[in-house]
């Protein structure tokens, strides 16, 4: 990741060399689409933060969604700022701000991935061990986990910045080691745990819903949809960060991979609010004038639904949604 950041001049050189070519045109088109996606995503995540932070009663799961929306908003803001700075003259001040925005983007990315891993793992535990989870789960576990993840990601990215920044004491050997630790953490721990827990959750809830003739809860759909979108759209950015340094790709190919990974990651961070409101508005023909807050609250509801769409008066979390 940091090796890629510090070698970003290769991409800039390729862009300067290929001005007027098909590659440069593709870069401009993809960057414009990414900027538009970032602006839409910032609006959507800001709406989620406003509703969850000031307009709704929050259950423990909503704490995760609130923090995930904040991480996505920070990622999209830094991505949009980076895209804007690329059009400015490369003076010394702009270079420093450009690197700051990239560091901020990597920080927000790791926070978002960590939160998604925590969300999918917690939901998996809640369906595999419902009684134990309900009785032994600390009251403020969600807030503690979110605070811990933000702190750990801040420390990790602060450490990498101290070793890998072009404007601080750059140490290539230490930067390489820190880069490998980050790669192992993201690609070898967080992503596999998130994928495995989500797959387990899907299989368990699918079997339970068929056995008890209940529809999966909307919360279950939200979790799986968010993880799936991340794996499809945002994971390529990690692959770009960690694979590009090892491969001697032509400059034109680097530009295309660079642009496509940014566009796909911006789509991933912008998609979650859309998922919440689409899932929350299912079967909304009975209440066609529901507010956005009500729709969001329905999407994050933990109670299971019966086949006809009713919510049981006394529900458990045993079937997993």
UniProtKB/Swiss-Prot annotation:
Region listing for Disordered, in residue ranges: 302-321
Gene Ontology cellular component terms for the protein in this record: extracellular space; plasma membrane
Membrane topology: Multi-pass membrane protein
Glycan attachment positions: 2, 6, 16, 92
Superkingdom of this protein's organism: Eukaryota
Cytoplasmic side: 55-59, 134-142, 206-218, 281-321
Keyword check for Iron-sulfur: no
Annotated TM spans: 34-54, 60-80, 113-133, 143-163, 185-205, 219-239, 258-280
Example GO biological process: angiotensin-mediated vasodilation involved in regulation of systemic arterial blood pressure
Keyword set includes Cell membrane: yes
Keyword set, alphabetical order: Cell membrane, G-protein coupled receptor, Glycoprotein, Membrane, Receptor, Transducer, Transmembrane, Transmembrane helix
MF GO annotations: G protein-coupled peptide receptor activity; G protein-coupled receptor activity
A Pfam cross-reference name: 7tm_1
Protein location: Cell membrane
InterPro entries to which the protein is assigned, alphabetical: GPCR_Rhodpsn (IPR000276), GPCR_Rhodpsn_7TM (IPR017452), MRGPCRD (IPR026232), MRGPCRFAMILY (IPR026234)
Residue intervals on the Extracellular side: 1-33, 81-112, 164-184, 240-257
Similarity comment: Belongs to the G-protein coupled receptor 1 family. Mas subfamily.
PANTHER family found in the cross-reference section: MAS-RELATED G-PROTEIN COUPLED RECEPTOR, MAS-RELATED G-PROTEIN COUPLED RECEPTOR MEMBER D
Protein name: Mas-related G-protein coupled receptor member D
Gene behind this protein: MRGPRD
């Amino acid at each position: 990741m940091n090796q890629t950041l510090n070698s970003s001049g290769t991409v800039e050189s390729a862009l300067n060399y290929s001005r007027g070519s098909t590659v440069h045109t593709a870069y401009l088109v993809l960057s414009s689409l990414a900027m538009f996606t970032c602006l839409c995503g910032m609006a959507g995540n800001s709406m989620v933060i406003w509703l969850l932070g000031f307009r709704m009663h929050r259950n423990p799961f909503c704490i995760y969604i609130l923090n995930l929306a904040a991480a996505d908003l920070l990622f999209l803001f830094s991505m949009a700022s980076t895209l804007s700075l690329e059009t400015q003259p490369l003076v010394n001040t702009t270079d420093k701000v450009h690197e700051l925005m990239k560091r901020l983007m990597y920080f927000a990315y790791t926070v978002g991935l960590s939160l998604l891993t925590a969300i999918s793992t917690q939901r998996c535990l809640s369906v595999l061990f419902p009684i134990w989870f309900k009785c032994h789960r600390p009251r403020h576990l969600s807030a503690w986990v979110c605070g811990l993840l933000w702190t750990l990601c801040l420390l990790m990215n602060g450490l990498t910045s101290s070793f890998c920044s072009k404007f601080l004491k750059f140490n290539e050997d230490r930067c390489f080691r820190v880069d490998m630790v980050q790669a192992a953490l993201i690609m070898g721990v967080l992503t596999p745990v998130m994928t495995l827990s989500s797959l387990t959750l899907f299989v368990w809830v699918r079997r339970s819903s068929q056995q008890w003739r209940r529809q999966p809860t909307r919360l279950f759909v939200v979790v799986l949809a968010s993880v799936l979108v991340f794996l499809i759209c945002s994971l390529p950015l990690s692959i770009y960060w960690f694979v590009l340094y090892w491969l001697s790709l032509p400059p034109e190919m680097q530009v295309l991979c660079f642009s496509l990974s940014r566009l796909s990651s911006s789509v991933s961070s912008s998609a979650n609010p859309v998922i919440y409101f689409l899932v929350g508005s299912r079967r909304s023909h009975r209440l066609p004038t529901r507010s956005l807050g009500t729709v969001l609250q329905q999407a994050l509801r933990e109670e299971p639904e019966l086949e006809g769409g009713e919510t049981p008066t006394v529900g458990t979390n045993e079937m997993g949604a």
